[in-house]
Amino acid sequence: MAGHSKWATTKHKKAANDAKRGKEFAKLIKNIEVAARTGGGDPSANPTLDDMIKKAKKASVPNDNIERARKRGSGEEAGGADWMNIMYEGYGPNGVAMLIECLTDNRNRAATEVRTAMTKNGGNLGESGSVSYMFTRTGVVTVQKGELSEDDVLMAVLEAGAEEVNDNGDLFEITCAPTDIQAVRDALVEAGIEVEDSESDFRASVEVPLDADGARKIFKLVDALEDSDDVQNVYTNIDLSDEVLAELESD
């Protein structure tokens, strides 16, 4: 879905408003703790941790909170939770496939909150494997466009396993296999190009076109899911035309 605005990405990101700011902070802090536990507490040797800290700073999370989360994760301070990654699958209104990624210390609470949000907003949970076959885990690395051309970026990452370079407005998005994320990052740094972000994402192989009303229903469901502290990301297979995007942006 290259070239579309954030509304049309397979992963719907909620807007940062005051009502949801606290929840967003909590999720960013959790990600830092988990990244430090998984790959060590040194950001210079742990790209995932480095990315998570940058995201938190960009969202104006206080430095003290960031540092405490890093120390909890690395074991320098006590108090870290036993986080579990859980992926729920299901369908939203109009047959839209949904993957709901949770990071939780309470499996029962996460399941209850996800099920409640789905049921109240026209969705239903499915069995494991019911929709995940429609999605592929993809590595995504982004860089600020600045003075760079698409060819500049492509030449830097071509030998590092990059599959595509897409123009997404102010950013270039590079897709690759998840196992090649580090190689792509290293190639960009070697070429003097600063990495904005990198993550493992889910991209749909089959997309469902929606009109504006259908899109609004999905976004309402996604917002309800992301109201749960346990829900980290929601991936869908929606496809929105430029006309629908224009209508949504005028809401």
Swiss-Prot record:
InterPro entries named among the record's database cross-references: Integrase-like_N, TACO1_YebC-like_2nd/3rd_dom, TACO1_YebC_N, Transcrip_reg_TACO1-like, Transcrip_reg_TACO1-like_dom3, YebC-like
Domain of life where this protein originates: Bacteria
A matching Pfam family: Transcrip_reg
Signal peptide: none
A GO term, aspect molecular function: DNA binding
A cellular component annotation (GO) from this entry: cytosol
Cellular localization per UniProt: Cytoplasm
Keyword Membrane tagged: no
GO BP: regulation of DNA-templated transcription
Region (Disordered): 1-22
Keyword presence, DNA-binding: yes
Keywords: Cytoplasm, DNA-binding, Transcription, Transcription regulation
Membership in a protein family: Belongs to the TACO1 family.
UniProt protein name: Probable transcriptional regulatory protein cgR_1708
